[in-house]
């Protein structure tokens, strides 16, 4: 049996965000076995433990962590390097790879 995929949003004070509702509805509409959670991070130091969770397939990143999160990632793509910010992270072979 295929395992449910987990995704989430990393940010601060993100209760206002439409992402959880949007992606949850999209997964249901597309009949995808996926969940989406908010990771409301008060302090940047919390991010490392969140990213170590290998059961989560990917994240969206919002303010104020788009730049600060880079130091916690294993790799970032060229666009993210050029911009100096990451807005999505994909877990590939237990590595966190940032994209923009």
Region locations from a protein language model:
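Phosphate/diphosphate ligand-binding glycine-rich loop within oxidoreductases
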Residues: 2-100
């Amino acid at each position: 049996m295929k395992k449910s995929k987990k995704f989430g949003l990393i940010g601060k004070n993100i209760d206002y965000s439409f992402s959880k509702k949007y992606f949850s509805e999209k997964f249901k509409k597309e009949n995808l076995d996926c969940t989406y959670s908010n990771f409301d991070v008060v302090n940047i130091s919390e991010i490392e433990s969140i990213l170590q969770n290998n059961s989560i397939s990917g994240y969206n990143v919002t303010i104020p962590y788009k730049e600060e999160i880079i130091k916690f990632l294993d790799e970032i793509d060229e666009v993210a390097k050029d911009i100096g910010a990451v807005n999505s992270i994909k877990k590939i072979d237990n590595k966190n790879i940032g994209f923009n």
